[in-house]
Amino acid sequence: MYIMKQSGWLEVICGSMFSGKSEELIRRVRRATFAKQEVKVFKPTIDNRYSDEAVVSHNGNSLIAIPVSSPKEIFEHISEKTDVIAIDEVQFFSDDIIDVVQTLADRGYRVIVAGLDQDFRGEPFGPVPTLMAIAESVTKLQAVCTVCGSPASRTQRLINGVPASYYDPVILVGASESYEPRCRHHHEVPDKPTKNGQTNNHLAR
């Protein structure tokens, strides 16, 4: 059933890990609930770092969330009473999430999504770049580089304390023990190919 409201839009919150994306999502959701709006919060089932059924920020704040394995499952949980739809860790969804949020916004819902805009390689992550392009509002947050204290826009993956290879799997859900924020200069990706076909291992840091 197509439920039409008067106006709808898409908000994207993005940035590196530890930049406060989930915290900002939680803040916006709580403001909406204070205004007596009905909010439905969703997360991918793959994200179970802190809880299977909650959005949890790195500082411990949380919201009850509905875990879904497919973007289209979101339609099963909303109704004409729903005002706001919030989706955390959106980078873990398939590209189907793009059509889903477009449809929801077109139907008049306020849609808020949060996720990583770059993977651990420093490359665009899943559907997030497209969501940024079609959104009415984009908030890009930065963390603090753990090496030098500069603004950090990248996520460093560490395996046993060593930077992960470019050829490691892109999706590996972790928390502080496996990731940390880095600036452009201190972000390390061993084996990353350069334009001339070589790896970047020989580059001076």
Curated annotation (Swiss-Prot):
Reactions catalysed: thymidine + ATP = dTMP + ADP + H(+)
One of the Pfam families matching this protein, by short name: TK
Biased amino acid composition, Polar residues: 195-205
Annotated Gene Ontology cellular component terms: cytosol
Region (Disordered): 182-205
Catalytic residues as annotated in Swiss-Prot or TrEMBL: 89
EC number(s) stated in the UniProt entry for this protein: 2.7.1.21
Protein name: Thymidine kinase
Taxonomic classification: Bacteria, Bacillati, Bacillota, Bacilli, Bacillales
